[in-house]
């Protein structure tokens, strides 16, 4: 049972998240010959003030 976690900044539409789940599932199924019914995709949206790069929060840039 593959479990894939995708972390990204907030702001994506439901349509984008739906497409992401579908495409990640397809890629994993094809790459490791896994049954798509057994593939789990976890989406973790991060607030821009909860993520930083180069010492600065994304929300402050």
UniProtKB/Swiss-Prot annotation:
Domain of life: Bacteria
A GO molecular function held by the record: isomerase activity
InterPro entries recorded: 4-OT, 4-OT-like_dom, Tautomerase/MIF_sf
SUPFAM superfamilies per record: Tautomerase/MIF
Protein name: Probable tautomerase BH3814
A Pfam family this chain is assigned to: Tautomerase
Annotated catalytic residues: 2
Family affiliation: Belongs to the 4-oxalocrotonate tautomerase family.
Signal peptide, first to last residue: none
Organism: Halalkalibacterium halodurans (strain ATCC BAA-125 / DSM 18197 / FERM 7344 / JCM 9153 / C-125)
UniProt keywords, alphabetically: Isomerase
EC number: 5.3.2.-
């Amino acid at each position: 049972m593959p479990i894939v976690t995708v972390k990204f900044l907030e702001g994506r539409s439901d349509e984008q998240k739906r497409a992401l789940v579908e495409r990640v599932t397809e890629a994993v199924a094809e790459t490791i010959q896994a049954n798509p019914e057994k593939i789990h995709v976890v989406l973790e949206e991060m607030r821009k003030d909860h993520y930083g790069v180069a010492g600065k929060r994304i929300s402050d840039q």
